[in-house]
């Protein structure tokens, strides 16, 4: 058994192993292999500021584990163990990757390791830690339970994440008209304008960088990176899926939500052109929507901007979908968690992220 660096000669084998973990599963769907390919070929915007070292463990000429080790210039204290996949539990194989991550940290002057963070929180954070028998939703992680054991048994600190769900069929009005009128006196919510898509991404990036500057694992984004993130997703989205809340005509917050496209992606399919076509023809088959990301600039927090976004979103989804599912929230983020508890029905899937301080 040995650790092998990924080169142009074996890159296809790396990608094939990654995709196999999703395409052969009844519960999982492949939505990230396209981005991973751009990363491995050096074509992603992130490659301009991120060191990547894809590695794989080979045993008897068979790949058994893969990862991309990452060092981001804007988060230099970490070496990230990204895009981690393992076809079966093998601690010896994991320790080969872990040892290389520690060595990479020494080389790059980093002093921490992360597990489950994929380059940046916008691309994924957290291994699944519950509901392993449930289907994966679009944009969320799904993995065997033993993934967590690799990190928990090797001295990593666990960071708990939680998502929420809500019954949209039997749900009462989110707020009454009196509150809605008061919100409308201060805030207005608008759809994004796809005719000026690049400019809308400028607004999105600006709010992100203000809203999440103190968030765990967040580092400043560049507009070009967010544009790359959205340019393919845009073909599945409608303008109403990216909302902005404004005060006196100035954007102060946003909400990204979209249908759970995994409900129309079949087993063995990769998210792509076929998904776009199926979404145009059969979007009514999707019964769940996801609130993926929300952000409000610090000066407008706890003043109603988030509530205005929720109200706008729920009015447009109430009779279209049966269920709402949120993205993950840090379990220690009491304000976000309490908001989820108040406006959702119950907790949904749990996830875990990992950090290890190197001495």
Where do the PLM segments sit?
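Acyl-donor binding region in acyl/amide transferases
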Residues: 76-154, 272-342
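Short beta-strand-to-coil "C-cap" segments at the C-terminal boundary of structured domains/repeats
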Residues: 166-169, 355-359
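Active/binding-pocket-proximal capping segment
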Residues: 222-226, 248, 256-275, 312-316, ...
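Short amphipathic alpha-helix that is part of the acyltransferase structural core
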Residues: 1-43, 50, 56, 182-222, ...
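Beta-propeller domains
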Residues: 208-216, 228-244, 255
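Conserved donor-binding loop and adjoining core beta-sheet/short helix segment
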Residues: 25-136, 236, 246-264, 268, ...
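Long, K/E/R/D-enriched contiguous segments that form extended
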Residues: 198-202, 224-231, 285, 332
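Acyltransferase donor/substrate-recognition loop-hinge adjacent to the catalytic core
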Residues: 141-215
